[in-house]
């Protein structure tokens, strides 16, 4: 009897190993390039991290009680602006339909038609918005970063930009300014743009025109008071907007900055290495590109220097958004 039981157990174990091997053989590894051409912040993990930081956000010790009339940057506080909401009830009937920004994958140093058409839509509608510089006849690119929350790589990115003498724009939330004021000070004092990415990172198209203004004003009030700084550049959270939202943002004096080059870099649990980041950006680079990278990505931080060097070897010049002429 014992012998029979032993034989049955042996057969069961063998079958289980066979089953494991069969399951493994069905596993496929997707090695294709990321092909998502829409908003790069749709991933829930990125949004959850921003929400998590917001819930526990406290002002860093660096940002408390300077004991002087100066702000953290050493600049004087700026006077706060009273924004006026034109057409608060949208009686002009501008579309409130949600648009998830799409850009397409550029190839052979040529922008994707999706980006070209997006820029045309902005221009035809007289919206103050940029996704692609189609005016310059030179090989220029604009480097921008979204900083929804801090993951420890912003300082490394700033070090590389300083070493390479490259200007950039950083789009931050109020919570990011509170939790990492040292980096904000560096951005400002080292000549970069700190753009308005709202107070709470909402889908702006889902808000009223007055609520949209309040999100923008809360950011502007905070950076004016604590850093003595303001800039006329705005980025829609999650890349979600509407014509009504574009109009409201422009009426407040801001240019909405989108992008024509990006990739799925925001998932900190799915980083693919610096070489992948470098190759992906360089394979999609094109004249007039507005490049979006996420500062939370270790791949971006490690690849940035090589990306800059290779782009320059290809004849590209990195310019500030301030150099863009609509």
Please give the residue ranges for each predicted region:
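Alpha-helical and His/Cys-centered functional microenvironments
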Residues: 57, 201, 298
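Metal-dependent polysaccharide deacetylase catalytic core of the NodB/CE4 family, i.e.
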Residues: 139-141, 151-158, 162-292
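N-terminal pre-catalytic segment of deacetylase/amide-hydrolase enzymes
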Residues: 20-144, 150-156, 163, 307-310, ...
């Amino acid at each position: 009897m014992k012998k029979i039981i032993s034989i049955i157990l042996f057969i069961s174990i063998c079958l289980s190993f066979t089953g494991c091997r069969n399951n493994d053989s069905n596993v496929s590894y997707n090695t294709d390039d990321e092909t998502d051409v829409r908003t790069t912040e749709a991933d829930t993990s990125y949004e959850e991290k921003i929400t998590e930081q917001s819930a526990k956000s406290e002002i860093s010790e660096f940002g408390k009680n300077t004991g002087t009339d100066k702000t953290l940057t050493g600049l004087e506080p700026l006077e706060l602006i009273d924004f006026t909401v034109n057409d608060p009830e949208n009686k002009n009937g501008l579309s409130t339909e949600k648009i998830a920004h799409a850009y397409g994958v550029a190839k052979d140093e040529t922008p994707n038609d999706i980006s070209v058409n997006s820029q045309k839509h902005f221009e035809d509608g007289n919206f103050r918005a940029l996704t692609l510089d189609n005016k310059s006849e030179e090989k220029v690119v604009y480097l921008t970063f979204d900083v929804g929350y801090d993951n420890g790589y912003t300082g490394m990115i700033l070090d590389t930009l300083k070493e390479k003498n490259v200007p950039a724009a950083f789009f931050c939330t109020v919570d990011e300014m509170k939790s990492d004021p040292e980096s904000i000070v560096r951005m400002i004092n080292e000549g970069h743009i700190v753009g308005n990415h709202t107070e709470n990172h909402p889908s702006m198209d889902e808000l009223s025109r007055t609520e949209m203004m309040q999100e923008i004003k809360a950011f502007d009030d905070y950076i004016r008071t604590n850093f003595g700084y303001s800039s006329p550049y705005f980025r829609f959270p999650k890349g979600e907007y509407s014509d009504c939202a574009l109009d409201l943002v422009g009426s407040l004096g801001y240019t909405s900055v989108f992008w024509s080059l990006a990739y799925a870099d925001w998932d900190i649990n799915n980083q693919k290495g610096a070489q992948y980041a470098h190759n992906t950006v360089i394979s999609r680079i094109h004249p007039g590109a507005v490049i979006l990278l996420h500062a939370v990505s270790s791949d971006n931080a490690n690849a940035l220097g090589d990306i800059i060097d290779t782009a320059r070897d290809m004849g590209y010049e990195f310019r500030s958004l301030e150099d863009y002429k609509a």
